[in-house]
């Protein structure tokens, strides 16, 4: 467990997990659902393969309607448009079978004009089967009617080359199978879909949730309408209009041009030649309703003044300010705890990928004792199922994943370390 705690951060860093985490959390805040994908990418590290963690576009993911847990869906489909040239280079059997995509995928509105004429829809189909009392996850990748890869058709037995000593004491290289073929074991040994959902505001009977845009767009639309009305009324009052008699003697062009100090008139200037059109100002209750709507939006989305560090003028006690901040951060704490739970599931899935695929020793640079760099070698030998005695019972190591937060800013680190340093100093003085 200690070794895993040291090498898993290396794996996350190789996947730029900070950016992946940020992108997924932005997706969660805006749309209500963030999805991570934990895969085994055989093309990584020059064909050796390694774990790949990527954000997943929830618009391209399809599951069984009515389920609240992705793992309970019988089938899961992930659709993606890929370039025809890339597909032909990887799968020559697709020659003459590719064309413009006829399927309509939900896409985000962008300023760029996206050309889909040279792209083809590729479907990744994940499905589960019960075999021998256990759940097996199978995978099929296809384009149109052509199957590109299917685990049920994969009979290849993975093996590694190891050096052994025979009966005569000579060293020989032998091929040792490390696991069964994919047609028997499936895609991943844990039997779970490689997708992790993180919801902001859960919806009953759905895997997805509401985002801040969903819960705040109603009040925001009303605020925008009232704000437009107030601005329009202000502009109308600032730029008055005039009624002019058809036989009026005032030069309109000169009267409308404020840069000209003189306005020419013909004959006597009567009071009824020009008359200003009166604009009724909006009553004060309109501004009050607008402010109330703004406060409603703040409380609905949890973006209150207390959350941003501002308190009412009458609140001065530190305990009262702390109580207000504690009460105002309930929604953010719930969202953070949800992200922690999703992150724990992601780490457990990473451990399962290590257990299944790290057959050969790999070198990692970790932080050793005293903060010094240390290079260690690790493989999955101690993670696999092990015999427990003559009864031929097998046990698989299981790990507890605990997520703890760390303050990122230097100021908070200094503020929290100051009491510790002071206590340490006082202990030496006494």
What spans do the regions from the language model cover?
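Extended alpha-helical, oligomerization-prone segments that build pores/tubes and scaffolds
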Residues: 1-429
């Amino acid at each position: 467990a200690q070794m895993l705690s040291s090498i898993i951060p290396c794996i996350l860093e190789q996947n730029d997990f900070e950016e992946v985490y940020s992108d997924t959390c932005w997706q969660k805040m805006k749309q209500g659902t963030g999805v991570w994908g934990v895969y085994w990418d055989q093309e990584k590290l020059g064909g050796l393969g390694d774990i790949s963690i990527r954000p997943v576009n929830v618009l391209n993911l399809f599951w069984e309607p009515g389920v609240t847990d992705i793992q309970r869906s019988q089938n899961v489909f992930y659709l993606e448009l890929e370039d025809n040239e890339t597909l032909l280079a990887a799968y020559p059997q697709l020659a003459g079978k590719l064309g413009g995509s006829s399927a309509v995928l939900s896409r985000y509105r962008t300023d760029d004009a996206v050309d889909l004429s040279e792209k083809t829809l590729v479907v990744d189909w994940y499905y589960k089967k019960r075999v021998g009392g256990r759940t097996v996850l199978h995978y099929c990748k296809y384009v149109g009617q052509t199957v590109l890869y299917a685990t049920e058709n994969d009979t290849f037995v993975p093996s590694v080359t190891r050096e052994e000593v025979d009966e005569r004491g000579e060293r020989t290289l032998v091929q040792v199978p490390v696991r069964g073929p994919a047609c028997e074991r499936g895609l991943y040994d844990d039997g779970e879909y490689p997708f992790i959902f993180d919801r902001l505001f859960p919806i009953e009977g759905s895997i997805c949730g509401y985002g801040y845009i969903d819960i705040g767009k109603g009040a925001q639309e009303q605020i925008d309408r009232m704000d437009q009305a107030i601005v329009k009324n202000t502009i109308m009052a600032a730029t008055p209009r005039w009624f002019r008699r058809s036989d009026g003697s005032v030069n309109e062009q000169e009267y409308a041009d404020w840069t000209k100090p003189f306005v020419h008139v013909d004959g006597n200037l009567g009071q009824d030649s020009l008359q200003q059109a009166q604009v009724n100002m909006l009553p004060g209750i309109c501004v009050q309703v607008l402010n109330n709507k703004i406060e409603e939006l703040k409380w609905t989305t949890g973006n209150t003044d207390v959350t941003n560090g501002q308190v009412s003028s009458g609140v001065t006690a530190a305990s009262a300010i702390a109580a207000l901040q504690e009460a105002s951060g309930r929604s953010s704490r719930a969202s953070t705890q949800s992200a922690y739970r999703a992150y724990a599931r992601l780490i457990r899935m990473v451990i399962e990928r290590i257990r299944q695929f790290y057959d050969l020793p790999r070198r990692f640079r970790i932080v050793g004792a005293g903060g010094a760099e240390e290079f260690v070698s690790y493989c999955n030998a101690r993670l696999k199922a092990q015999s427990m005695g003559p009864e031929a019972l097998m046990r698989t190591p299981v790990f507890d994943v605990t997520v703890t937060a760390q303050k990122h800013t230097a100021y908070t680190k200094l503020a929290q370390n100051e009491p510790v340093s002071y206590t340490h100093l006082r202990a030496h003085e006494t």
